[in-house]
Each structure stands twice: as structure tokens, then as C-alpha cells.
Regions:
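Phosphate-proximal small/polar/acidic motifs at interfaces that engage nucleotide phosphates
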Residues: 192-193
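Charge-rich, well-structured scaffold segments of protease-associated domains
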Residues: 1-131, 167, 197-309
């Protein structure tokens, strides 16, 4: 994730009592040695378990392949946790968790009194003169290729394939989301119909487009029987090539339109989900016109435009 976030759910009548606690967490955390030791031990144990999972190995190798040794792609080893020191956390905390780096997004029944409470807690007496942490990364497209992690004892193979792509700031991003949905973005997608329903190679396969602050990427992920891994790769490539060379039937495109518009409506069911939608565009430097453009694109994009993408 590009941001660290703390979410608080509370009744209006308790706002005055709980906001100072939240402010204390953001301003006065001390990272006790005992708690840090427990955290390190738990993370090392979790990592040890995950390193036995094919999908975890594929996911972290994929991230490292496209993002390199940036925080987006660095592989963490057990030894890295051993080197984690309390003073490192405190120094980073002081530089990163400060007023100019903080954004408050409030959702719910907020009226004049609630805003006054919010401002009284976070609007003053929060000073930090430490130099700010500003992380910004650039990436270069990795050369195409295949990476194989050998696990002879495994009865399943994890597949993760993709590449650097566009982010939410690009004008083609909504159209790319439609294309992704067709390929592997929902249960009725082409990848599911072929790899799961027709061939029976997997219980599930999907694709996604992910927008980060400094980059975007596209990926396809699944787990298949080890003996059909190569066959699955052939079928995945076939489905991608069909989208490049053939126009999508109107009936299939209409089904995807309805699914995406319904999902959009379902994701706006309450004030908290509205806040999440706002956060997506706010941290991308966009405004609410993004969602209007998204809906228009889903409704009007043509098969030819998708083929061109």
C-alpha cells in the first residue's frame, strides 16, 4: 500500500472521548521492546509458513521482477526482521507520521459539532520539526521472460504473470478495467470459462489491474495441477491473443457492462464505502469526475476500442 492508514468507527456521542486516543497513537507511539520482539517472532513464523506456499513464492517473485528492490518489490527474509531495531522505527515514525503527511477523511453523520471536535483534536498542538520522508519511485519495464521456482515435491503449480501497466491517472484506465473484467475479472470471465469450466485445470483463476501512486501493473494468477501447468499457460496466452485479434460479441460485452455497473453500485452502499471511493481518487490526485468518466466508459466503450487496447 502507498499509505499507512488508521480507521476508527465510533458513535457520535463517543467522538470527544476516542479521538484523543487516536491522536495519541499517531503522535506518541513508543514501540516497546517487548512488543517489537513479539511482532518480529510472529512475522518470522508467518514468513516461514508462507515460504512453503506456491502462491506466496510466485507473488513475491513476480513483484520483485517488475518493481526490483524498491519497497514495492523487495523480498523480505527472516534475517531482515532480526535487524529491525526500535530506534529505526522511532526515527521513521517521527519523520513520516506528522501533520503535513496526514489526511483526515470523515464519513457519517458529521455536522458542525463533530467537525469542531475533529479540529480541536487534530487542528492544533501537533508539531513536528523532523525532516519529512518523501518516497517516490520510478520503474523500467522488465524484459519479458519466465522464472521457474522448482519444488519437486509440490502437486500444484502457482502461476502469476503480468507486467507494468497504466495507473488510475491514465485516461485509458477505465477501458483497461473493462478489458480486464472480460479476461479474468469476474466469475463469468474468459479465463474462468476456459481454464476452470472447460479444461478443469483449476478451481479459480483471475486477473486484475492495480493502481499505485507511482506505477500500475496487470497480473493473472491461478494455481493448477503440476502436470497441466504448461497446458494452462498455453490456454491463458490463447485467451489474451483472442482479445487482441477478434472483436468481442455484443452479448458478452453487455454482460460485463451490467456486472461492472452493478458492482459499482454495490460498492456505494454506505458512508464508509463512499469514503473509500473518495480516498482512491484523492490520493491519485483526481476528483469525482473520475467516476463519472468510469461509468461513461463502461456504458459506451466499443468492441473495437477494447481490441485496440
Amino acid at each position: 500500500a502507498d499509505q499507512s492508514s488508521v480507521k476508527l468507527y465510533t458513535l457520535n456521542k463517543h467522538l470527544q472521548s476516542v479521538l484523543p486516543i487516536l491522536r495519541s497513537i499517531l503522535n506518541e507511539s513508543i514501540f516497546p521492546e517487548q512488543e517489537l520482539a513479539i511482532f518480529v517472532q510472529n512475522q518470522k513464523q508467518s514468513l516461514q509458513v508462507n515460504l512453503q506456499k506456491n502462491d506466496f513464492l510466485a507473488r513475491r517473485q513476480f513483484a520483485n521482477s517488475i518493481f526490483g528492490d524498491t519497497p514495492y518489490g523487495s523480498n523480505i527474509d527472516a534475517e531482515d526482521y532480526d535487524e529491525l531495531k526500535r530506534e529505526d522505527l522511532i526515527n521513521y515514525f517521527k519523520a513520516a507520521f506528522k501533520p503535513e503527511n496526514c489526511t483526515v477523511i470523515a464519513a457519517g453523520k458529521f455536522e458542525e459539532n463533530e467537525f469542531a471536535i475533529l479540529n480541536s483534536v487534530f487542528g492544533n498542538q501537533w508539531e513536528n520539526t523532523e525532516s519529512s520522508v518523501i518516497n517516490k519511485f520510478t520503474f523500467e519495464a522488465s524484459p519479458a521472460g519466465e522464472l521457474l521456482i522448482e519444488r519437486p515435491e509440490a502437486i500444484q503449480s502457482a502461476i502469476r504473470m503480468g507486467a507494468l501497466s497504466i495507473s488510475r491517472n491514465h485516461h485509458d484506465f477505465p477501458g483497461f478495467q473493462v478489458l480486464n473484467c472480460l479476461l479474468g475479472g469476474y466469475f463469468g470471465s474468459r479465463l474462468m470459462a476456459n481454464i476452470r469450466e472447460d479444461k478443469g485445470y483449476t478451481y479459480g483463476i483471475g486477473s486484475a489491474v492495480v493502481s499505485l501512486r507511482d506505477a500500475g501493473y496487470f497480473f493473472i494468477a491461478t494455481e493448477v495441477g503440476a502436470e497441466v501447468c504448461n497446458n494452462a499457460l498455453v490456454e491463458i496466452e490463447k485467451e489474451i491473443n483472442l482479445l487482441k485479434t477478434e472483436l468481442i460479441a455484443d452479448q458478452e460485452l453487455d454482460l460485463v457492462r451490467n456486472y461492472m455497473l452493478g458492482s459499482m453500485l454495490g460498492s456505494l452502499e454506505n458512508a464508509f464505502s463512499h469514503a473509500d471511493k473518495f480516498k482512491n481518487v484523492y490520493f491519485s490526485g483526481l476528483d469525482h469526475n473520475y467516476y463519472e468518466n468510469y461509468i461513461t466508459t463502461v456504458k459506451t466503450i466499443t468492441s473495437q476500442e477494447l481490441k485496440d487496447l
